[in-house]
Regions:
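Transmembrane helix-loop junctions and nearby membrane-interface residues
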Residues: 104-111, 193-196, 225-231, 252-259, ...
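Charged, glycine-enriched surface loops/patches
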Residues: 158-159, 206, 417
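Hydrophobic transmembrane-helix bundles of small-molecule transporters
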Residues: 171-283, 290, 308-309, 316, ...
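Residue-level signal for the membrane-embedded core of alpha-helical transmembrane segments
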Residues: 71, 125, 216-219, 293, ...
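Short, highly charged, low-complexity non-transmembrane loops/tails of multi-pass membrane proteins
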Residues: 467-468
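12-transmembrane solute porter fold
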Residues: 20-35, 40-42, 51, 55, ...
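A residue-level signal for alpha-helical anchor/packing sites in multi-pass solute transporters
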Residues: 133, 167, 195, 223, ...
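Transmembrane-helix bundle of Major Facilitator Superfamily
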Residues: 2-194, 327-331, 335-352, 356-363, ...
Length: 468
């Protein structure tokens, strides 16, 4: 009698069909956590009315999610290396699903903010595990295609938030933007438990001092950028930023001296000798800056200048979501075949052209249908950047560092998004009439040029020995 081959739970290798099935399970949860970054925006007037919330309280419903999502990422990425990516993903999904239920049931704005904070923490446990697992279960020459699906999900979720949120709020109430996560979360738990294998994990413990230093530094930086524009940049906030800089210096020193102290670094600095990883982490922060910062001026311009309602404005972005989601899987497959810099440079080129078009359209206040041009360009730009950039950044790193690398990569993306929101908001307030919108797009052009320069330095093969 023949024996069934054992499930490959202690190896990083999977049959290709099983790897694709595992990825589809992971993408269900990944879609949810990115959707929840933007879906809440359209419900903010209802929070103000139904929960008797102040403007500052309403802002915190969004801010606290981004804060608790971004701050722990360096740690949660490493937790996947230590305790297993599948285990940490499942824990994160339980936290995210239960806190989503709590959000929908919240009867006061304070309870909603607390539940959103827990939701963000659950998302931080989930996000880095998806990238780590992709790079462990797919062979090297198929990771671009896998990242193509991952990139399609990321782009589609981020862009669909306002549109889907508008429909849900209009027809069934704001509570359902949270309740909808519960059945999807349960499905994700079942699929991941069944289809994602248990992978080998690191044996060393995580350095507690590094955890403290990373949390302080990322919290101080993100909180300062997030709340500075709303609080008017008081002196104590600058003090917090200075403390964050000090904590960051301490964190780097702890990583540098980890071996000497007989412990494992939270972020092995040797990873940054890998040229593609270092450049990719920088370029994805530029993308985070632009994607995170442009949605607000675009939506405000469409509603305040072009006299659209929220749903009409969201529908103008449909070409961006459709093109990005459709294109990313095909671009991912190309990333396995041609030089990595080519696709990323094309993507940043489209993004730069879109920002230039937005600057011109917003400055001149031309007809609303002209906004479809930058929407199409942004769709192509997102489709050409996310998956090639991710695949190239992670492709040559050693397996034992993938969790830490995923944490760094996702942290730089989130910090870029927060920085973009703060910087673009400040530029908009300095302008007069439509010039504020246009000037914010000029800032995006500058940032995108730096991203374009970074990806132009990608190499086809990196020195993996340096990373090892």
């Amino acid at each position: 009698m023949s024996q069934t081959p054992p499930h490959p739970q202690h190896t990083a290798e999977l049959p290709l069909s099983d790897a694709w099935r595992a990825l589809s399970a992971l993408c269900v949860g990944f879609f949810m956590i990115l959707l929840d970054q933007t879906i809440v925006a359209v419900a903010t007037p209802h929070f103000h009315k139904d929960l008797d919330a102040s403007l500052n309280d309403v802002i915190w419903v969004t801010s606290v999610y981004l804060l608790t999502f971004a701050v722990p990422l360096l740690v949660t990425g490493r937790l996947g290396d230590r305790f297993g990516q599948r285990t940490i993903y499942l824990i994160g999904m339980v936290v995210f699903t239960l806190s989503s239920l709590a959000c929908g049931l919240a009867s006061t704005i304070e309870l909603l903010i607390i539940a959103r904070a827990l939701q963000g923490f659950g998302a931080s446990l989930i996000a880095p595990q998806t990238m780590s697992v992709i790079n462990r279960i797919f062979p090297r020459d198929k990771r671009g295609a896998a990242m193509g699906m991952w990139g399609a999900v990321a782009g589609f979720a981020s862009l669909m938030g306002p549109l889907l949120g508008g429909v849900i709020v209009a027809y069934v109430g704001w509570q359902w933007i949270f309740f909808i996560n519960v059945p999807i979360g349960v499905v994700s738990l079942v699929l991941v438990a069944r289809w994602v294998p248990v992978l080998p994990r690191a044996s060393r413990s995580i350095d507690a001092l590094s955890v403290v230093a990373s949390v302080i530094s990322v919290f101080a930086f993100v909180f300062t950028l997030q709340e500075g524009p709303h609080l008017g940049w008081p002196l104590w906030l600058w003090g917090l930023l200075a403390a964050g800089v000090g904590a960051f210096v301490w964190f780097v020193w702890l990583q540098y001296t980890a071996a000497r102290r007989g412990t494992e670094p939270l972020v092995p600095l040797v990873m940054f000798r890998n040229r593609n990883f270092a450049l990719g982490s920088f370029s994805i922060s530029a993308m985070g800056f632009v994607v995170g910062g442009t949605m607000v001026p675009i939506m405000l311009f469409l509603q305040d200048v072009q006299d659209m309602n929220a749903q009409q404005a969201a529908f103008m972005l449909i070409p961006m979501a459709v093109i990005s989601g459709t294109l990313a899987p095909f671009v991912g497959r190309l990333a396995d075949r041609i030089h990595p810099r080519v696709l990323s440079m094309i993507g940043f080129g489209f993004m730069t052209a879109a920002a230039l078009a937005l600057a011109a359209i917003m400055r001149d206040g031309v007809g609303r249908w002209w906004m479809l041009l930058p929407a199409v360009l942004l769709g192509f730009g997102n489709g050409f950047v996310w998956s090639p950039n991710s695949a190239t950044s992670m492709r040559d790193l050693p397996i034992q560092s993938l969790g830490a690398a995923s944490g760094v990569y996702n942290t730089t993306r989130q910090i870029g998004s927060v920085l973009g929101s703060a910087a673009i908001g400040g530029v908009m307030q300095m302008g007069v009439a439509n010039s504020g919108y246009a000037n914010s797009m000029v800032l995006c052009v500058i940032v995108l040029i730096f991203g374009l320069i970074a990806v132009s330095r990608f190499t086809e093969r990196t020195d993996t020995a340096a990373a090892d």
